[in-house]
């Protein structure tokens, strides 16, 4: 085992040190980003539902 227990301890120590250097978003930014993601997901969901319905109607029309 290269490093062993000391290696694992150093790894987690480095992780903690790196997490302290991270620039975390404010609550306001986080809320805004979350709403943007949810809005984008909703838009894409509706878009693909409409496209799916259109293709289904087209195929049904060709079959009948």
Swiss-Prot record:
Coiled-coil region list: none
Molecular function per GO: protein transmembrane transporter activity
UniProt topology in membrane: Single-pass membrane protein
Record keywords, A-Z: Cell membrane, Membrane, Protein transport, Translocation, Transmembrane, Transmembrane helix, Transport
Any single biological process term in GO: intracellular protein transmembrane transport
Chain ranges passing through the membrane: 35-55
PROSITE patterns: SECE_SEC61G
Heme as UniProt keyword: no
One term under GO cellular component: plasma membrane
One Pfam assignment: SecE
Localisation per UniProt entry: Cell membrane
Alphabetized PANTHER family for the sequence: PROTEIN TRANSLOCASE SUBUNIT SECE
Function: Essential subunit of the Sec protein translocation channel SecYEG. Clamps together the 2 halves of SecY. May contact the channel plug during translocation.
HAMAP family cross-referenced by the UniProt entry: SecE
Subunit structure: Component of the Sec protein translocase complex. Heterotrimer consisting of SecY, SecE and SecG subunits. The heterotrimers can form oligomers, although 1 heterotrimer is thought to be able to translocate proteins. Interacts with the ribosome. Interacts with SecDF, and other proteins may be involved. Interacts with SecA.
Family: Belongs to the SecE/SEC61-gamma family.
Protein name according to UniProt: Protein translocase subunit SecE
Primary gene name: secE
